[in-house]
Design a protein with these regions (language model features):
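Short, surface-exposed, charged amphipathic helix/loop patches that serve as local interaction elements
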Residues: 1-239
């Protein structure tokens, strides 16, 4: 018998925020090494690419699951589940006291991470009496494009997200399927909107689902507790 056939890995099942049920195994040493190398590179594109490849390796069902097409929050949740089953439910993070500016190391419980603002319905927003827009949430591949932007939630990023995620535009006369239109045409439409209507776009995208961890930490020097909030997915990419 081959040595590689001796090892038997456990299998787990999880229901993702979108409702998709997946069956998976924990990642193994070779995959942990891939993640460590990505972490050390500090290159976000490489990190996300490695996360995608590790998830793809570990998924048993559904077969041939296209990670790129999953909602980005499904991939985030799935990776956190994989991390829990593979290496334990806690990681060490550094937190900063906003009052004293001191940094401390503390333990983060991965099982307490929540994904907020989730709805499984496509979002429809009425811009004015004549126009409404239906959005979809960004897929993981969309999320990678967005994450490469450098202006956080600035105008360029909001335009990029909006252009990617506009699903349909409704007028009194017709319904326009934007998935069949060039990206540039959608951006041109968005750029012609009055400021008040564009702000409705901004509010939607700023309230998209996100991972969230809320706790508190007691400063051992002052004895005062301060809140700890983590919302950036990369903060959980700690092995």
């Amino acid at each position: 018998m081959s040595l590689k056939n001796i090892v038997s890995l456990p299998e787990y099942k999880s229901t993702l925020p979108s409702g998709l049920v997946v069956r998976y195994r924990p990642f193994v040493v070779k995959e942990e090494k891939i993640l460590l190398m990505a972490k050390e590179s500090k290159d976000m594109e490489q990190i996300y690419s490695c996360i995608k490849n590790v998830i793809k390796n570990c998924i048993i069902e559904p077969e041939n699951l296209d990670i790129d097409k999953l909602p980005y929050f499904d991939v985030q949740q799935l990776f956190i589940h994989l991390r829990c089953k593979s290496m334990g439910e806690s990681v060490q993070i550094r937190v900063k006291d906003p009052e004293t500016k001191q940094s401390f190391e503390t333990e983060l419980d991965l099982e307490k991470i929540k994904i907020t603002n989730i709805t499984k319905k496509l979002q429809k927003i009425k811009l004015n009496e004549n126009i409404a827009v239906e959005f979809r949430y960004p897929s993981f591949s969309d999320f990678l494009k967005i994450s490469n932007k450098t202006d956080d939630v600035g105008l360029e990023t909001l335009l990029s997200v909006a252009g990617i995620c506009v699903n349909k535009v409704f007028t009194k006369e017709e319904t326009i399927n934007c998935t069949e239109l060039p990206h540039e045409e959608i951006l041109e439409f968005i750029n012609t909107l009055p400021k008040k209507e564009f702000e409705k776009f901004c509010e939607f995208f700023k309230s998209m689902p996100k991972i969230s961890y809320n706790s508190s930490f007691k400063n051992p020097v002052t004895g005062k507790a301060f809140p700890v909030e983590v919302t950036d997915f990369t903060d959980f990419f700690i092995l």
